Amino acid sequence: MTEISILNDVQKIIVLDYGSQYNQLIARRIREFGVFSELKSHKITAQELHEINPIGIVLSGGPNSVYADNAFGIDPEIFELGIPILGICYGMQLITHKLGGKVVPAGQAGNREYGQSTLHLRETSKLFSGTPQEQLVLMSHGDAVTEIPEGFHLVGDSNDCPYAAIENTEKNLYGIQFHPEVRHSVYGNDILKNFAISICGARGDWSMDNFIDMEITKIRETVGDRKVLLGLSGGVDSSVVGVLLQKAIGDQLTCIFVDHGLLRKDEGDQVMGMLGGKFGLNIIRVDASKRFLDLLADVEDPEKKRKIIGNEFVYVFDDEASKLKGVDFLAQGTLYTDIIESGTETAQTIKSHHNVGGLPEDMQFELIEPLNTLFKDEVRALGIALGMPEEIVWRQPFPGPGLAIRVMGAITEEKLETVRESDAILREEIAKAGLDRDVWQYFTVNTGVRSVGVMGDGRTYDYTIAIRAITSIDGMTADFAQLPWDVLKKISTRIVNEVDHVNRIVYDITSKPPATVEWE
């Protein structure tokens, strides 16, 4: 069975990308209902969509104005496909603008809305079935609809938005001015589920077993009888990729585990024992720590660190691949969140990712990225579906650049050791407290800041270590974890007493946004 035939058997809802930083959340929410969903460029044609054969289309939000000269548009024939369409924020304005309505700066129609607002439903609608007549939603728009196209009618408004929800049931076109994909829209999940199940007719039978079948077929068709190299870090993402690839192509896969000197405590030996021993992956271990640390000496800028590490990573692969024959592909554990934070065609780059933006232009391999449509929690579910043990699947996320981006400023062996040892203590105590499944991610950072302290009878002037612990569902947004004070106290006491050159511990209580998870 080909990949296309597998895809045709799977119901899917396509999200067209108009530039919102969080439009991937739309696809993520829809997948929660057992419906496959993915992002496509707004430039896609009606014919291309017809070939994909979705049961529904969502037009995402975005930062532009639909009446601007550089506005992102849509193939008008998409409206004639007979496929249900939901426009969100910019998407609703685009439907209105293209079908004969009017969109103006919000000041001419009421006020701009940024933050939670109360939606007042004026009519019943399939889209809002089971939700209250008044509900809190997240608004974020500088433009507003003042006239709706022929055939549409008002469903809901807010105090500052005359048309907050509209629909044309005859043509299966729906528009909402707010963002149901974010948690601040209290009934947002219900609205998206109504669209997927009630309006689009989704069965809700998408699962990780479907994904495994589809990806294995895709990998086999892409690779054929050629060979693949996988950069194995020992983290969840690359480990899951390794097991998936081995299931697809067996001994055509060679894993290269690069010890760049930026790993967590004892991580190298753990990787070899777990994946090389238990799963039988063919792993070549390369000690390239001196190469990386020499290149990173005196480099303070985090983007330069990422680029240097990304480039050198591939050059190490080139060196190893030259010793092998017939290697054409490089596999990576790139996730959906990596792609959006590195910027899409329509979205601004937040930070370059090692798996996305750190690759040299003269790279000698074709890329295979089996996880690039998945979020972190879906990767864990995939690992379980592949039969991987929980100690691997629930391993703490670890960035490709390793501890390099958990040391602020220039990297030294001394700084690396403070992070390596303090991180080990943090992970040990979180596990002892039974919190390792409740906290999404937790690690320590050498802030690069030194402060005065007193230890024993002497004055110290040593490093400040920050603890970062977050809770999240999908990694796109996050809150700081409210760890028990007694646990934090024990962690702090142990780090200061057991780790050399550290005399102060601080706790990062910043959410994402405005911060990112990693400090660099």
Swiss-Prot record:
Enzyme class: ligase
Gene3D superfamilies tied to this protein: 3.30.300.10, 3.40.50.880, HUPs
Location of the active site: 89 (nucleophile), 179, 181
Occurrences of domain GMPS ATP-PPase (ranges): 206-395
MF (Gene Ontology): ATP binding; GMP synthase activity
Keywords: ATP-binding, Glutamine amidotransferase, GMP biosynthesis, Ligase, Nucleotide-binding, Purine biosynthesis
Entry GO terms, CC: cytosol
Span of domain Glutamine amidotransferase type-1: 12-205
Superkingdom, taxonomy of origin: Bacteria
Name of a matching Pfam family: GMP_synt_C
Binding site residues for ATP: 233-239
Enzymatic reactions: XMP + L-glutamine + ATP + H2O = GMP + L-glutamate + AMP + diphosphate + 2 H(+)
Pathway listed: Purine metabolism; GMP biosynthesis; GMP from XMP (L-Gln route): step 1/1
EC number: 6.3.5.2
PROSITE patterns assigned to the protein according to its UniProt record, in alphabetical order: GATASE_TYPE_1, GMPS_ATP_PPASE
Record's subunit section: Homodimer.
UniProt cross-references to HAMAP family, sorted A to Z: GMP_synthase (MF_00344)
Function comment: Catalyzes the synthesis of GMP from XMP.
Name of protein: GMP synthase [glutamine-hydrolyzing]
Organism per entry: Streptococcus pyogenes serotype M3 (strain ATCC BAA-595 / MGAS315)
Source lineage: Bacteria, Bacillati, Bacillota, Bacilli, Lactobacillales
